[in-house]
Amino acid sequence: MNHLDLFSGIGGFSLGLEKVGFKTIAFCEREEYCRMLLQKHWKGVKIYNDIKKLEGKDIKEPVDILTGGFPCQPYSVAGKQKGTNDDRYLWPEMFRVIKEVKPTFIIAENVRGLINIQDGMVFETVCSDLESEGFEIQTFIIPAAGVGAPHKRERVWIVGYSKHNGSLTSKIKRRYNEVDAGTQK
């Protein structure tokens, strides 16, 4: 299954997904040091450096899962919390790429401040944007300490499945029934 990694950093999403059988087909990361690390670990995988210039037609293979930890500075309590008025507010660019490549799954990650900034309207925009494109979404808040980190910073996770591919629930039930009946293929 193919993975497109936006706002890649040093490739955490790709590393995790690689361990369960996904193939990263492209990265988008602007920081030079991160791009150097990505290039070293994922030799031959295309690295785009500007989300604003990345177009869906640039991605030649189908995308099964698209991930992205879009910039958190507009929402972080450590920053000025300018929300949509911050130059680093790049959700609209990530959403544009989602619409263009039409992945089956998306996973987005950000700081907890995303939920509250501008009276919750930014978080609502992210969720309603995805739903308007036919995604069933679930949101989670997971503290970093919950997965073994030595701090408890809470992260917001948004997981979506494209309803254009049929109901995820029915696929899970069908798969479970195949396994249960001993007919797993």
Language model features by range: what are they?
Residues 1-3:
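Extreme N-terminal starter segment of soluble prokaryotic enzymes
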Residues 32-36:
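Short alpha-helix immediately C-terminal to the canonical SAM-binding loop
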Residues 5-10:
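Class I SAM-dependent methyltransferase "Motif I" SAM/SAH-binding loop
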Residues 54-65, 73-185:
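Class I S-adenosyl-L-methionine
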Residues 28-30, 109-110:
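Conserved acidic E/D residue at the C-terminus of a beta-strand in Rossmann-like folds
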Residues 16-23, 41:
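A short, Lys/Arg-enriched amphipathic alpha-helix followed by its capping loop at the start of a domain
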Residues 44-51:
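Conserved SAM-binding strand-loop segment of SAM-dependent methyltransferases
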